[in-house]
């Protein structure tokens, strides 16, 4: 079986951590380049493009800031789910191919997978705009998209 997991819906929602970083970045960089998180697109792929333009105002590498914030705050926002991780272990042990996707930027998604204990179980992980399509392409035909924790736990193991 080839399984594509929606990271935010199945393993742990990264959006609250993303929103906390946006608030922190708006406060931290307000004297360099004003940022109003409420004006950013809810689609994080589009928001990343908006942040690229914002960073040109003197902020620089916002990805590095997001990575540091995520390293510091992920344990507060994201908790491993023992049942979900057990299901991933069983899938992996029987030779299934597992991928995950999120529209979150790469530093946030990658560190979230590590915090949630899922990173080492995956063959492929994709982040940002078009992540779902890239994971499905990498996994190949016949992939099953898992869109909730309940769907993961209901997979035949």
Q: What is the role of each PLM region?
A:
Residues 1-82:
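N-terminal helical cap/lid subdomain that shapes the substrate entry/recognition surface
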Residues 17, 106-108, 130:
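Short alpha-helical
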Residues 21, 108-111:
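Phosphate- and divalent-cation-binding pockets in alpha/beta enzyme and binding domains
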Residues 25, 50-53, 90, 112, ...:
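Residues within well-ordered alpha helices
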Residues 72-99, 110:
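Short, acidic loop-to-helix structural element flanking the phosphoryl-transfer center
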Residues 92, 110-157:
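Asp-based, Mg2+/Mn2+-dependent phosphohydrolase catalytic module
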Residues 99-100, 145:
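Structural beta-sheet core signal
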Residues 102-104:
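Conserved phosphate-coupling serine/threonine residues in phosphotransfer and NTP-handling enzymes
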